[in-house]
């Protein structure tokens, strides 16, 4: 590996500014061309909680009705993706192409963000290094993997997160290595704010993933800027949080206007979260980790909590609820499905007639359960809590660590990243497919092979998929090797960092460590949900924000520490 890097350094390719942008345009064109060979995936009637929910909300936005008629799903998830779909529809931009363009924009910004790490290189070589990083990010296999073909929010979530990380990294590096006149940091902070706000509004868990990095980066920049008396730049640190507050405020105001709910969700926050947290307090004889409110706990609740008795038939006897949500192997509701089952049961009882009725009902349930647990009427296994997720227990620790390690290796080797669905074919009537195609301006893989139920792909499409499969294999081999060497170089730079103790030495090291830490955090978050609630196996879709972070860390370390020592201020 050292010999290979030495030879690559000896080549020293140089680019003019015009050549750089021509190559960047060509890379973007080729990356967008990938979507020409891909077909989107849909399942009308089979994904009411996910793809159909987003599609329904997007159509409502287009019709001027915000998220549509209120029911148990309307405010159950963060809905920025529905706004994105409505925007693409307004622009007449194909769904898959829109996602690819957003990814390319975030990738290009990320490549420029890290450019100060090789600022000492000649201008032509620095452009070549920037272009190479952009190309590697643009064609990252996870960015065109099959999960992106679903009409779901994870199509854009990795790009939004990359936009945020690029903005914060770009601002931090320029705060250290340049003056305000040489390179202002406010545009980078604005980009970070857009990524933070849109990501936060796109997934409920985005705050836990993005805000730690935002706070750490802000504190590091403040230390540097205040020490150098750059007061305006220090004041500009409020920009990302102001953009986030504005985005959240707009969504909350719209929800208040249309549904009377000041909040982003009536699922992960508010009275329903209180009720779910209260239900998980009830003691149970079950030791199955995937169950949050097992059958014996529900029986105790039906007996002692009158408000829940109306839901008993739907949860315990109705055959459709059993088929839709109950795990046949466990003969019970997994934690990741129980909250949807009980919300739908409440829908059938008229509880979701409007937001105020639903809020009052779930608050009464939460208050009754907590009171019963506090006075001993119901046996309790924990204190009061408000959450739809499982509480952290000792039984989850080791399985979560194992799953997190598996997830990191899964992401490093780009597992489950085919560019198409090999066996899953879009399901829906001719009218359904026509409606989705017309709104999203793209085609779906609903055609079947002759005599089979697998999707049909043209010979040229199959050829493109094979080429992308080869590219995935190249990434899967080279990134793990480069990653190991990057970790070695990163650790070897630590002693010199401790000796020098300057901002120019410390901040790049800390920044790269932060990117790696965020990748680890995401693996840990998804691992906990997997072992405590889902039990669906390692998922590329949920780990899709990890791949670009690993690449940025690896590339940054290999370039930043390609020579002995730490880059100078």
Residue ranges and their predicted role:
Residues 39-57, 66-84:
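Extracytoplasmic catalytic/substrate-binding loops of multi-pass membrane glycan-assembly enzymes
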Residues 16-47, 138-140, 243-254, 519-523:
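Transmembrane signal-anchor helices characteristic of membrane glycosylation enzymes that use polyprenol
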Residues 44-49, 53-54, 241-397:
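Juxtamembrane membrane-water interface segments immediately following transmembrane helices
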């Amino acid at each position: 590996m050292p010999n290979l890097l030495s030879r690559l350094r000896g080549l020293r390719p140089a680019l003019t500014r015009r050549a750089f942008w021509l190559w960047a345009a060509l890379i973007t064109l080729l990356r967008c061309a990938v979507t020409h060979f891909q077909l989107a995936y849909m399942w009308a009637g089979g994904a009411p909680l996910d793809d159909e929910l987003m599609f329904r909300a997007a159509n409502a936005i287009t019709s001027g009705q915000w998220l549509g008629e209120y029911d148990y799903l309307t405010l159950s998830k963060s809905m920025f993706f529905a706004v994105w779909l409505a925007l693409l529809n307004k622009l007449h931009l194909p769904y898959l192409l829109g996602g690819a363009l957003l990814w390319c924009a975030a990738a290009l910004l990320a490549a420029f963000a890290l450019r100060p790490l090789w600022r000492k290189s000649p201008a032509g070589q620095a452009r070549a290094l920037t272009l190479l990083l952009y190309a590697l990010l643009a064609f990252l296999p996870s960015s065109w993997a099959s999960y992106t073909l679903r009409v779901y929010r994870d199509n854009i979530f990795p790009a939004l997160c990359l936009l945020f990380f690029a903005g914060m990294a770009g601002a931090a590096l320029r705060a250290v290595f340049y003056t305000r006149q040489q390179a202002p940091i406010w545009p980078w902070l604005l980009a970070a704010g857009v990524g933070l706000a849109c990501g936060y509004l796109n997934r409920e868990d985005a705050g836990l993933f993005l805000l730690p990095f935002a706070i750490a980066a802000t504190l590091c920049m403040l230390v540097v800027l205040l020490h150098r008396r750059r007061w305006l730049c220090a004041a500009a640190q409020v920009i990302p949080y102001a953009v986030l507050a504005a985005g959240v405020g707009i969504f909350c105001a719209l929800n208040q206007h249309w549904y009377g709910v000041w909040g982003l969700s009536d699922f992960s926050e508010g009275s329903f979260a209180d009720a779910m947290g209260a239900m998980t307090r009830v003691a149970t004889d079950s030791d199955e980790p995937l169950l949050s409110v097992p059958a014996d706990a529900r029986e105790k609740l039906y007996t002692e909590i009158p408000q829940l008795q109306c839901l008993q038939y739907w949860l315990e006897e109705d055959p459709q609820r059993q088929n839709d949500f109950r795990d046949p192997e466990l003969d019970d509701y997994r934690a990741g499905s129980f909250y949807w089952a009980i919300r739908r049961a409440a829908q059938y009882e008229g509880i979701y007639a409007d937001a105020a009725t639903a809020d009052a009902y779930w608050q009464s349930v939460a208050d009754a359960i907590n009171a019963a647990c506090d006075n001993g009427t119901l046996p309790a296994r924990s204190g009061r809590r408000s959450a739809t997720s499982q509480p952290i227990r000792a039984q989850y620790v080791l399985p979560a660590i194992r799953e997190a390690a598996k997830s990191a290796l899964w992401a490093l080797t780009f597992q489950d990243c085919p560019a198409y669905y090999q066996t899953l074919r879009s399901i829906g009537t001719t009218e359904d497919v026509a409606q989705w195609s017309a709104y999203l301006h793209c085609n779906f893989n609903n055609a079947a092979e002759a005599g089979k139920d697998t999707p049909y792909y043209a010979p040229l499409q199959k050829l493109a998929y094979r080429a992308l499969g080869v590219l995935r294999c190249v990434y899967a081999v080279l990134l793990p090797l480069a990653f190991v060497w990057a970790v070695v170089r990163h650790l070897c730079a630590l002693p010199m960092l401790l000796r020098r103790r300057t901002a120019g030495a410390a901040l790049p090291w800390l920044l790269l460590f932060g990117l790696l830490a965020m990748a680890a955090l995401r693996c840990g978050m998804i691992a906990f949900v997997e072992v405590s609630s889902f039990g669906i196996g390692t998922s590329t879709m949920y780990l899709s924000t990890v791949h670009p972070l690993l690449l940025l860390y690896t590339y940054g370390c290999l370039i930043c520490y390609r020579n002995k020592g730490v880059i100078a201020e």
